Amino acid sequence: MLIDSLHISFDSFNFESILPMLVLVCGGIFTLLINAFTSRFSRNLNMFLCMLFLVLDFLVVLGLEQQENAFFGFLSLDTLSLVSQSIVLISAFLLIFLALSKERFNEFQTAEFYPLYLFIIAGFQFMVSSNHLLLMLIGLETASLPICVLMALSGKRYGLEAGIKYFTMGAMASAFFAMGAMAFYLLTGSLNLEVITLYLYTEGVTNPMLFAMGVIFLIGAIGFKVSLVPFHTWMPDVYEGNNPVFASYISIVPKIAGFVVATRLFGAFIDTRIAWVEDIFYALILITITIPNLIALWQEDVKRMLAYSSISHSGFALACVFIHTEESQKAMFVYWFMFAFTYIGAFGLLWLLKSREKTWDERYDHPYSKFDGLIKTHPLVAILGAIFVFGLAGIPPFSVFWGKFLAVESALESNHILLAAVMLANSAVAVFYYFRWLVAMFFNKPLQTQSYAESDIYTQNATMPIYAVIIAMALVCLFSVFMMRGLLEFVA
């Protein structure tokens, strides 16, 4: 028979393995019911419930023991799963703090936002823990569909456009994933990754056509989710159409989930040592690191620049997946951990400076001219911005430098000299567009008069929780060197 008989033993159920997801699913349902049976919506109550369930979930994850096969073999509670769940939950917790702003933007004033936010995180937790293609697809859909809704909650044209684009690209990615899973099911008779990997190791590629179809479709699906070139075109517009809080969310959380899935999926493909498979990954990495870097040089809006730089950072993470060693896996987690904290801080800064009026540009919310002379009008904000610029540019000893250092080191140790050279060259290119933001803040003259600056239009969205998150992220970025030992032990 093509398919082995299905034997279900409740000894392998392991209820604890799905407890983190159940916490958030139950939390989302509870929050939904609270809103349904209360006459008046309370943003503070909803945010408190969100934070409470995220903290409970994080504590549950910390208490889990590693187990290779759980929940009837569908889940794997390995280091990859537990570390990525931790990064997802920490990022989600920090980002929900940024919603505590003075300006009452529509998306944070709706009862639907908060339960959907919890459902999204639960979906990503299923994705990073799954050892089965079907459950990965379910987690992908559970996370993707609510994201489209949250994008459109602003009610603005650009928000609706972003939601439609994300939905369209997400539907295409899901279709690609389903087609790739079908190809490997026909090839191996299973959707379980362990069975697929074992089949490829022992039997080899018995049907090159099915193998090629599966690899190409799955690369396309993951490529859309983590915005690899040439699947990246939706991302800058989606960034532009969303507020900085949600833009930072979609640049961090879905991508870490996508790269964990890529690590589980693509490791088996890379280990086949088939030349064209390696060539595809090599080409994807090179163009994903390089092309967005060059496009970012010509952007006039800081948010769009950060969108393209995020795509380039995805190329560095994919390089770690491609190298496929224990050291490169550590490098990927360190890279994305540092990237997440720095991006939360940078986008928190944009959120701090966001206003309803497009005072500086008819189209863009955050053109470079908005930051001209910020050191004179708001010195603290400018200094925080400089820290995040140094971190994103990979200037030692700031945050992302350590991720890039480990990525390049793992490439050199694996004899990928060209890959290491491309990463170093593009790191140098990235300095130019990051420092353009720095120059605007520190060396350009303010466009507005001093009396206009004193009207505090730059920080009319500021609150103490937002300042607290941004300053905390700046401290992490600044003193990341002291975190490296503990972080490497955590991801080991």
From Swiss-Prot:
The chain crosses the membrane at residues 18-38, 45-65, 80-100, 108-128, 133-153, 167-187, 209-229, 250-270, 277-297, 305-325, 333-353, 381-401, 415-435, 464-484. The keyword Cell membrane applies. This is NADH-quinone oxidoreductase subunit N. Its EC number is 7.1.1.-. NDH-1 is composed of 14 different subunits. Subunits NuoA, H, J, K, L, M, N constitute the membrane sector of the complex. GO terms for molecular function: NADH dehydrogenase (ubiquinone) activity; NADH:ubiquinone reductase (non-electrogenic) activity; quinone binding. GO terms for biological process: ATP synthesis coupled electron transport. One of its GO terms (cellular component) is plasma membrane. InterPro entries: NADH-Q_OxRdtase_suN/2, ND/Mrp_TM. It is found in: Cell inner membrane. Belongs to the complex I subunit 2 family. It is an enzyme of class 7 (translocase). The gene is nuoN. NDH-1 shuttles electrons from NADH, via FMN and iron-sulfur (Fe-S) centers, to quinones in the respiratory chain. The immediate electron acceptor for the enzyme in this species is believed to be ubiquinone. Couples the redox reaction to proton translocation (for every two electrons transferred, four hydrogen ions are translocated across the cytoplasmic membrane), and thus conserves the redox energy in a proton gradient.
